[in-house]
Amino acid sequence: MTVSVVVPVKDEAENVAALAREIAAALKAEPAHEILFVDDGSTDGTAAALAALKKEIPHFRPLRHDRNLGQSRGIRTGVRAATGEIIVTLDGDGQNDPADIPALLKTLRADPELGLVSGVRVKRKDTASRRVASRLGNRFRDAMLRDGAADTGCGLKVFYRDAFLDLPYFNHMHRYLIALVQREGWKVAYVPVNHRPRLAGRSKYTNLGRMLVSVTDLLGVRWLQRRHGGRTKIEEL
């Protein structure tokens, strides 16, 4: 199966080249693969940096939104444009380690009942305030969704393209992929992964900003959980 790596980025001109090269190195054992970076309306030199990488990295496909639409839309744009049956996503700031991709792919391929494999960050390199906010947010989320998510904020995930496109789309949906995939009747597995300091630049998110949107999103996902019966086998008679 072809593997498509999808990386949404916003104002990451200093990070994209190094990250793209690391991803290409991690995929050397994959005979059929492609790398898609989705520039979500950057206002720095991200678009130019991505265009330059087309000459350097085989199977590299940069895409660009004409305005900022958010991380979930960036992922969805990449998945819809992808030709691979298996999708890998990771954040564009370099904190996810591409060297962990093969382990997640191996786990997904080992069990046909799995729809998604998520990384679980070990020894996180975030600030203390972000770690505390994440811990509290995860507890509240688990109380609401009961999805057993081991690390909701890890951007490194592997899943089937068709499974993703079956999910209801909404802004910030990338934070709830585990619950949404389970809602469709798939199993989810977890793999410990490395976590690194940001390569360059600053985060686009704040703890308060995440909290404000999370309450509404959690209520929406809980509503969705109660109104779906999961996968079914369809037979033509």
Short names for language-model regions:
Residues 65-81, 95-174, 196-223, 229-232:
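Acceptor/aglycone-binding surface of glycosyltransferases and processive sugar-polymer synthases
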Residues 169, 179-196:
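Catalytic donor-sugar/metal-binding loop of nucleotide-sugar-dependent glycosyltransferases
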Residues 87:
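Short aromatic/hydrophobic "clamp" motif used to bind/position activated sugar donors
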Residues 2-4, 34:
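Cell-envelope/extracellular polymer assembly enzymes that use nucleotide-activated donors
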Residues 33-36, 47-81:
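Conserved donor nucleotide-binding strand/loop of the catalytic core
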Residues 12-26:
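Short, well-formed alpha-helical segments that are part of the catalytic scaffolds
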